[in-house]
């Protein structure tokens, strides 16, 4: 069974509810690796167990007719698309699982397009043929309508719903009827001849010589048909379609047969792009002779075991006791045991070569997207592109004892998911987590609680507002304090002027004649900077102000650094109040990608959020890109609304553009809310 040619890996992709997890569980049960065909063996994450759904990818290895097979079950929810992206990235084959009742759904289309972008060949498995209203012909017609690749049904159902009893392999001309674990093989009924003739034409047209023989009336043999089917599949030109039922275990053996017979092996697969230490781009091919290299595509934090790392071996061979380097972190790791995954169990192996998936325990580092490599060739595999996390919430530990634990827990969780990030904002004093949607953050926060024991309160993150002035004003303040010994004396006159947006702060010294000694000028500057930390309207930092120090006075004995700082602080506050202050808000440059039919609704939604649409342009595959500028305060729940408008097909990116003045009616609300906040803090 050794050798690259005998390894197969496939990612199971599709919409939530298409039956991917049950399909994997049934395959493992039929292979004798688990006791029962139950998704509880697949969804073993503590949050998944509680909610009964898949929120992460699950990996299993098995042996099938002389092949080492690795299957990656990916989640069907769009919020967990990073798991799908990585699953596709490390698989040489893709199995798109389609619900025979619902047909092509949103995630069917989105994940298919991802496989297209990564140039991965696709097999379709039409699942749930035993369900009421299952319709194989409708699904095939929909696949042909939606996707550009040639759709070729090769394993078709016998009956449907309660009459579903088996499948026909049109190429082998064999029918398979299932009765529990028993399978009866028989010749293909004549009623399937027309269907077979139709798909033969689709296959033989891939090979000109074969097509001529077929047109001359020659009966093309099974081996030649499979050879041409494999060539078309490998090139991404043909999509073989199979059918069955994961629940009843029908057609799964044929699915594995086709994966073994036409599936792409590591030996036939394209190379991975990588970077050398000096930034030179190279390609790393699947090879036992090359120095070791593996890509980390999954990282799990287990409350008992610790860090569990899943890696795809691309080059070289990994053995227990080997020393490897985490290239991104520049950390040397000593590999203890080497395992292959069987869901939450692991099987220890003596070695793992190219194309195989390994599980490593208790590595010091190992975030998703990082590379483990031989110390003499520290290559970094270029990871796939992940969507930017745009849905944010603030989190606060419910217990003071959890303050130290929250950073550690969030860091470990972000290691496991490149679309989950967190940061502490010193300006607002908040810890802010960001992900791809409300469900995404809910699951990550639940994991924080169940795995790390940190319970948090969740809220909308505070907006980093600013305050500024809109006109020129002059102010002065004389700070005078007499005590028993030395007193305090500082006197400043300043002029405040608005600066162009984004200029920050400028201090101008126009003192002449020594009315304020040179050694106290920095004290005035320091006092003004301190005053600018809290504006007079709502206590937000002040920006875009020029302060000119033009006059003042001092006392030979009582003047000091602190005296001039206090005088400057008070003078600045007076000046700002007189200079017609306003609140500024961050404006984001937003790009929204939506289906063409939803563009109008999305433009309207943007306008209702005080946004300015800037234009629209095609972005391919029936999608358009809407460009706009929108206040950040209006984008906090946009992700959920966009998902609702586009049925989960839309997504967006945004980046900070500039600050702008808040409209007066909005400013009043911000000031009132800020006052309530400060009153709460004082209690």
UniProtKB/Swiss-Prot annotation:
GTP binds at residues 14-21, 73-77, 127-130. Keywords: GTP-binding, Nucleotide-binding. SMART domains: EFG_C, EFG_IV. Residues 5-267 form the tr-type G domain. InterPro entries: EF-G-like_DII, EFG_II, EFG_III, EFG_III/V, EFG_IV, EFG_V, EFG_V-like, P-loop_NTPase. The keyword ATP-binding does not apply. GO terms for biological process: ribosome disassembly. Belongs to the TRAFAC class translation factor GTPase superfamily. Classic translation factor GTPase family. EF-G/EF-2 subfamily. One of its GO terms (molecular function) is GTP binding. This is Elongation factor G-like protein. The keyword Transmembrane helix does not apply. It comes from Thermotoga maritima (strain ATCC 43589 / DSM 3109 / JCM 10099 / NBRC 100826 / MSB8). Pfam families: EF-G_D2, EFG_C, EFG_III, EFG_IV, GTP_EFTU. It comes from the Bacteria.
């Amino acid at each position: 069974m050794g050798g690259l040619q005998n390894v197969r890996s496939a990612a199971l992709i599709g919409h939530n509810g298409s039956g991917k997890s049950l399909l994997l569980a049934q395959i493992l049960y039929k292979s004798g690796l688990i006791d029962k065909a139950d998704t509880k063996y697949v969804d073993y994450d503590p949050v998944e167990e509680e909610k009964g759904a898949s929120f992460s990818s699950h990996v299993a290895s098995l042996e099938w007719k002389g092949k080492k097979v690795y299957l990656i079950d990916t989640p069907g929810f769009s919020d967990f698309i990073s798991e799908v992206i990585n699953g596709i990235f490390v698989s040489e084959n893709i199995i798109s699982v389609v619900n025979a009742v619902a047909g092509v759904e949103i995630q069917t289309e989105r994940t298919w397009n991802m496989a297209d972008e990564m140039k991965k060949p696709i097999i379709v498995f039409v699942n749930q043929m035993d369900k009421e209203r299952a319709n194989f012909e409708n699904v095939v017609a929909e696949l042909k309508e939606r996707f550009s690749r040639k759709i070729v049904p090769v394993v078709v159902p016998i009956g449907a719903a309660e009459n579903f009893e088996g499948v026909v392999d049109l190429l082998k001309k064999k029918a398979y009827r299932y009765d529990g674990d028993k399978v009866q093989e028989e010749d293909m009924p004549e009623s399937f001849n027309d269907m077979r003739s139709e798909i033969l034409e689709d296959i033989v047209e891939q090979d000109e010589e074969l097509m001529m023989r077929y047109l001359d009336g020659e009966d093309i043999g099974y081996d030649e048909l499979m050879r041409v089917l494999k060539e078309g599949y490998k090139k991404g030109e043909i999509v073989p379609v199979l059918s069955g039922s994961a629940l009843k275990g029908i057609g799964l053996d044929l699915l594995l047969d086709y994966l073994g017979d036409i599936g792409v092996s590591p030996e036939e697969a394209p190379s991975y792009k990588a970077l050398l230490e000096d930034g030179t781009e190279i390609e790393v091919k699947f090879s036992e002779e090359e120095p070791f290299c593996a890509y980390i595509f999954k990282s799990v934090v287990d409350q008992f075991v610790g860090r569990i790392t899943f890696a795809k071996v691309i080059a070289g061979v990994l053995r227990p006791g080997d020393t490897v380097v985490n290239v991104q972190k520049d950390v040397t790791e000593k590999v203890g045991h080497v395992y292959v995954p069987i869901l939450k169990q692991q099987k220890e192996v003596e070695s793992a070569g190219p194309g195989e998936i390994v599980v490593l325990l208790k590595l010091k580092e190992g975030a998703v997207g990082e590379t483990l490599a031989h110390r003499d060739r520290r290559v970094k595999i270029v990871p796939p592109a992940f969507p930017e996390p745009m849905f944010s919430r603030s989190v606060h530990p419910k217990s003071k004892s959890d303050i130290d634990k929250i950073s550690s827990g969030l860091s470990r969780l972000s290691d496991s998911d490149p679309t989950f990030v967190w940061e502490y904002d010193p300006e607002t004093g908040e810890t802010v987590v960001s992900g791809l949607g409300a469900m995404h953050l809910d699951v990550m926060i639940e994991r924080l609680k169940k795995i790390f024991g940190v319970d948090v309160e969740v809220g909308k993150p505070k907006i980093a507002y600013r305050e500024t002035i809109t006109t020129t004003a002059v102010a002065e303040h004389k700070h005078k304090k007499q005590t028993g010994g030395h007193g305090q004396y500082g006197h400043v006159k300043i002029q405040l002027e608005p600066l162009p947006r984004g200029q920050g702060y400028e201090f101008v010294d126009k003192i002449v004649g020594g009315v304020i000694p040179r050694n106290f000028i920095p004290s005035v500057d320091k006092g003004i900077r301190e005053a600018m930390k809290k504006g007079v309207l709502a206590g937000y930092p002040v920006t875009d102000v020029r302060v000119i120090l033009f006059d003042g006075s001092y006392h030979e004995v009582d003047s000091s650094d602190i005296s001039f700082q206090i005088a400057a602080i008070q003078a600045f506050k007076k000046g700002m109040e007189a200079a017609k202050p306003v609140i500024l808000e961050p404006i984001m440059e937003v790009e929204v990608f939506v289906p063409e039919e939803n563009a109008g609704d999305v433009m309207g939604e943007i306008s209702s959020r005080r946004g300015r649409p800037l234009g629209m342009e095609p972005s391919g595959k029936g999608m358009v890109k809407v460009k706009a500028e929108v206040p950040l305060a209006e984008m906090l729940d946009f992700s959920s609304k966009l998902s609702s408008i586009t049925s989960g097909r839309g997504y967006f990116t945004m980046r900070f553009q500039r600050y702008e003045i808040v409209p007066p009616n909005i400013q009043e609300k911000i000031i009132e809310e800020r006052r309530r906040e400060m009153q709460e803090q004082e209690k």
